[in-house]
A protein has these predicted regions:
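Charged, amphipathic alpha-helical linker segments immediately N-terminal to NTP-binding catalytic cores
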Residues: 1-16
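Long amphipathic alpha-helical scaffold segments
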Residues: 15-35
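Globular "head" domains of long coiled-coil molecular machines
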Residues: 28-267
């Protein structure tokens, strides 16, 4: 299928030679060789960064309310450890970063988060070799400018392709505002994420019902109900319950922590 797609794109590039469309087609061909780009979106405190850390298998993305969570952040596989700032209307620049037994702290070099288009974190990782993960600022933020950065990144109501190949949309419950957001992916143009590559995540599933022992089972039933709802089905491929913090803890479990759990289980 990839070979057929490449051949079709090359024919289209030749047919549209000299037009603006040819550049977009060349970009599409180049992306065939890149890892899948998956954007993670959702409201503030939905658990986006926690899920991203679980998918990477390492605690890289900050989960607090610091400046870095107000900027679109790309996490991509690299041969070395590097952070690059992409200021709006200026040349990209490498920047120092620190990591003290936790998330990466990037030096913004005195720039306001609103003046930075994106941060790219290169990190040697088998998980990131398969897909580039994109953490986006929270929607429905008190600061509308922060939410707008995510909307602009995903190319809502703009005549350009979104940089994301697929979108994971995190929600606690399916509200009208969630439907409006997912409808933005239901574009007629194939270049935009559609229900085929938009997945709804019922996040923080272990907290359902005030964290009852059967919370995960309850979350699965809720997800099943949403999957059977025609209004939801037309907006996303499926709905999956996820306990992001549990997944992150499992993916980043250290040997000493495993031994402690094994000792407790033996009591």
């Amino acid at each position: 299928l990839a070979a057929q797609t490449r051949l079709l794109l090359r024919k289209a590039i030749a047919a549209y030679a000299g037009r603006d469309a040819a550049d977009r087609l060349r970009e599409a061909e180049a992306r065939l060789d890149d890892p899948l780009r998956v954007a993670i979106a959702g409201k503030v405190k939905a658990g986006k960064s926690t899920l991203l850390n679980a998918l990477i298998g390492d605690e890289l993305a900050p989960t607090d309310a610091g400046d870095c969570t107000k900027i679109v952040a790309w996490y991509t596989n690299g041969n070395t450890y590097r952070a690059t700032l992409y200021p709006s209307g200026a040349e990209p620049r490498q920047t120092p970063f620190s990591r003290d037994q936790g998330a990466i702290e990037v030096d913004l070099q005195g720039l306001d988060p609103g003046d930075i288009d994106r941060i790219v974190i290169e990190w040697p990782s088998a998980s990131l070799a398969e897909m580039t993960l994109i953490d986006t600022p929270g929607l429905a933020s008190v600061n509308e400018e922060i939410s707008k950065r995510t909307e602009d990144f995903l190319a809502f109501e703009h005549d350009r392709d979104t940089p994301a190949d697929a979108v994971l949309y995190l929600m606690r419950h399916f509200h009208r505002s969630d439907a409006r957001f997912l409808e933005a992916f239901h574009a007629e143009e194939l270049a935009h994420p559609s229900p085929v590559n938009a997945i709804a995540i019922l996040s923080r599933a272990d907290e359902l019902g005030s964290g009852r022992p059967d919370a995960l089972e309850s979350a699965q039933r809720v997800a099943n109900r949403y999957r059977g709802d025609a209004r939801v089905r037309r907006l996303c491929q499926t709905v999956l319950p996820v306990a992001g913090l549990l997944a992150q803890s499992g993916a980043t479990l250290r040997e000493v922590e495993y031994q402690a759990l094994a000792a407790l289980a033996a009591l």
